[in-house]
Amino acid sequence: MAGRSGVNDEELLRAIRVIKILYQSNPYPNDSGTRQARKNRRRRWRARQRQIRALSERILSSCVGGLQEPSTLPLPPLDRLSLNPEEDLGTSETEHPQGTATT
């Protein structure tokens, strides 16, 4: 697949097939039974979904090589930051007074 270097396409497709099988192995529970039984089934289903999601992330990260660290963003100087809302009023030309609509 274009844009990736060093990743075997067959290995990636195999990982995706495994993840698909994992998700298909845990269908949403049916609506029969008492309210409490349905609630318990949904709770167990959500727990299994969390486990499947964690496994899927581990499979993909081992195949692709993990997530890239985001580059650090330059932050403004802390002495210019303010929590006073009065200083923030009217700083943007796109702000409109409350209650007026723009078309």
Swiss-Prot record:
Keywords: AIDS, Host cytoplasm, Host nucleus, Host-virus interaction, Methylation, mRNA transport, Phosphoprotein, RNA-binding, Transport
Region: Disordered, residue numbers: 25-48, 66-103
Residue ranges the record marks as coiled coil: none
Modification sites for Phosphoserine: S5, S92
Compartments it resides in: Host nucleus, Host nucleolus; Host cytoplasm
Oligomeric form and interacting partners: Homomultimer; when bound to the RRE. Multimeric assembly is essential for activity and may involve XPO1. Binds to human KPNB1, XPO1, TNPO1, RANBP5 and IPO7. Interacts with the viral Integrase. Interacts with human KHDRBS1. Interacts with human NAP1; this interaction decreases Rev multimerization and stimulates its activity. Interacts with human DEAD-box helicases DDX3 and DDX24; these interactions may serve for viral RNA export to the cytoplasm and packaging, respectively.
Other notes: HIV-1 lineages are divided in three main groups, M (for Major), O (for Outlier), and N (for New, or Non-M, Non-O). The vast majority of strains found worldwide belong to the group M. Group O seems to be endemic to and largely confined to Cameroon and neighboring countries in West Central Africa, where these viruses represent a small minority of HIV-1 strains. The group N is represented by a limited number of isolates from Cameroonian persons. The group M is further subdivided in 9 clades or subtypes (A to D, F to H, J and K).
Function according to Swiss-Prot or TrEMBL: Escorts unspliced or incompletely spliced viral pre-mRNAs (late transcripts) out of the nucleus of infected cells. These pre-mRNAs carry a recognition sequence called Rev responsive element (RRE) located in the env gene, that is not present in fully spliced viral mRNAs (early transcripts). This function is essential since most viral proteins are translated from unspliced or partially spliced pre-mRNAs which cannot exit the nucleus by the pathway used by fully processed cellular mRNAs. Rev itself is translated from a fully spliced mRNA that readily exits the nucleus.
Protein name per UniProt: Protein Rev
Gene source species: Simian immunodeficiency virus (isolate EK505)
Chain's gene name: rev
